[in-house]
């Protein structure tokens, strides 16, 4: 049996797995210290009571011979698709265009597999490392990094002389924590239409947006229906990280170059490759959408971001993002300090684990990412430790 040649292009370990190994090793060698882990974007708040009740009720029905059921619909429960259309998208996306899945990362892999190998894929730099790995695993012909630099407010730089087939775009962004405004998103949509580019828009953090003028969906730009697919997730807002539930939107207007409708092929693709998301997860998702605008967990994580930002600024760092995303993109004031050295410094001196920016791409060099998804007591303890960071000041 021959090895899949695409594995050769991957690094030995996935970024976050490697970081957790380093943290575990530090804990093993330094049992006297308590490490606060702000390096991963994992949720810490429990399920809302009404969501947990819906989940439990669904499981109870599966345990009864009179109410149990087998496979659900391949494309998702009609009630969940309809509620997303009405409550989340306010009618700008039809229920038939929404396809329920087992999470955003799985859908990203399905989509890049669906469009096939030999595509030229453009990715924001820095970006969530799964984009790069999945593009490699699915046989991308070329992967183009779009620098998102501080001097451009982390807005991607687009080439004028390079053909792109697929653009992976994330807003609110992971890792920079920044969000595109409507004018910026409209400009990207028009660029994509002009250059015949498909946008895969990752909106997994859209529920963190508190400013009503900022777009939560790419389909707030009407022309995006001709060039974009949107991916979203219940993981962060509802605490479904371990439950696995997400969705993808395929507009009915979206076509290939030959005029064939993408949604028709997607339905055929899912019928072959996916038997539908967990029914209890979907029924819990319906309950979650009813309380999403008032969800306490989102406010909790925003408050965490505010606490971290104040502590980091007081320490002398430059801080970006965090207002509309659970991530803060942080630049040390000390010159000539590498990402790895900064990671080790925090772990060694303050027993705080963060994510080195270089792990998200070359343009992440000189930055680190803080996650605000931790427990409040850990955030407060981290803020207290950050007050003792004179060694990092210029």
Swiss-Prot record:
This is LL-diaminopimelate aminotransferase. Substrate binds at residues 14, 41, 105, 128, 174, 275, 369. It catalyses: (2S,6S)-2,6-diaminopimelate + 2-oxoglutarate = (S)-2,3,4,5-tetrahydrodipicolinate + L-glutamate + H2O + H(+). Pyridoxal 5'-phosphate binds at residues 71, 104-105, 128, 174, 205, 233-235, 244, 275. NCBIfam families: DAPAT_plant (TIGR03542). Pathway: Amino-acid biosynthesis; L-lysine biosynthesis via DAP pathway; LL-2,6-diaminopimelate from (S)-tetrahydrodipicolinate (aminotransferase route): step 1/1. Involved in the synthesis of meso-diaminopimelate (m-DAP or DL-DAP), required for both lysine and peptidoglycan biosynthesis. Catalyzes the direct conversion of tetrahydrodipicolinate to LL-diaminopimelate. GO terms for biological process: lysine biosynthetic process via diaminopimelate, diaminopimelate-aminotransferase pathway. One of its GO terms (molecular function) is L,L-diaminopimelate aminotransferase activity. The lineage of its organism: Bacteria, Pseudomonadati, Chlamydiota, Chlamydiia, Chlamydiales. Keywords: Aminotransferase, Pyridoxal phosphate, Transferase. The modification N6-(pyridoxal phosphate)lysine is found at residue 236. Belongs to the class-I pyridoxal-phosphate-dependent aminotransferase family. LL-diaminopimelate aminotransferase subfamily. Homodimer. Gene3D superfamilies: Aspartate Aminotransferase, domain 1, Type I PLP-dependent aspartate aminotransferase-like (Major domain). HAMAP family: DapL_aminotrans_1. Disulfide bonds: none annotated. Its cofactor is pyridoxal 5'-phosphate. Its EC number is 2.6.1.83. InterPro entries: Aminotransferase_I/II_large (IPR004839), DapL/ALD1 (IPR019942), NHTrfase_class1_PyrdxlP-BS (IPR004838), PyrdxlP-dep_Trfase (IPR015424), PyrdxlP-dep_Trfase_major (IPR015421), PyrdxlP-dep_Trfase_small (IPR015422).
């Amino acid at each position: 049996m021959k090895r899949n040649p695409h594995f050769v292009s991957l690094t030995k370990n996935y970024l976050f797995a490697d970081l957790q190994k380093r943290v575990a090793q530090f804990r093993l060698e330094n049992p006297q210290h308590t490490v606060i882990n702000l390096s991963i974007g994992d949720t810490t708040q429990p399920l809302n009571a009404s969501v947990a009740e819906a989940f439990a009720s669904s499981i109870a029905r599966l345990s009864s011979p009179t109410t149990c059921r087998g496979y659900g619909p391949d494309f998702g429960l009609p009630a969940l698709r309809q509620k997303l259309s009405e409550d989340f998208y306010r009618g700008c996306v039809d229920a038939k265009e929404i396809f329920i899945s087992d999470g955003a990362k799985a859908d990203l892999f399905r989509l890049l597999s669906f469009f096939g190998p030999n595509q030229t894929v453009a990715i924001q730099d820095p970006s969530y490392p799964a984009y790069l790995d999945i593009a490699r695993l699915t046989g991308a012909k070329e992967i183009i990094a779009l620098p998102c630099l501080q001097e451009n407010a982390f807005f991607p730089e687009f080439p004028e002389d390079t053909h792109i087939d697929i653009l992976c775009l994330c807003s609110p962004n992971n890792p920079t924590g920044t969000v595109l405004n409507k004018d910026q998103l409209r400009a990207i949509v028009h660029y994509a239409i002009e250059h015949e580019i498909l946008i895969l828009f990752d909106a997994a953090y859209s529920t963190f947006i508190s400013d009503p003028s900022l777009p939560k969906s790419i389909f707030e730009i009407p022309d995006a229906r001709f060039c974009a697919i949107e991916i979203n997730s219940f993981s962060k807002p509802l605490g479904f990280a371990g439950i696995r539930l997400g969705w993808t939107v395929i507009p009915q207007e979206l076509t290939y170059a030959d005029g064939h409708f993408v949604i028709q092929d997607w339905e055929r693709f899912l019928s072959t490759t996916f038997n539908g998301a967990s029914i209890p997860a979907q029924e819990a998702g319906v309950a979650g959408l009813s309380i999403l605008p008032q969800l306490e967990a989102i406010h909790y994580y925003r408050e965490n971001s505010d606490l971290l930002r104040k502590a980091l600024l007081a320490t002398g760092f430059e801080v970006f993002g965090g207002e509309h995303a659970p991530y803060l993109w942080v630049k040390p004031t000390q010159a000539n300090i590498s990402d790895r050295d900064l990671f080790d410094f925090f772990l060694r001196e303050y027993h705080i684990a963060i994510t080195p920016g270089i792990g998200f791409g070359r343009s992440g060099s000189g930055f680190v990412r803080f996650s605000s998804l931790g427990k409040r007591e850990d955030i407060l303890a981290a803020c207290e430790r950050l007050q003792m960071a004179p060694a990092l000041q210029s």
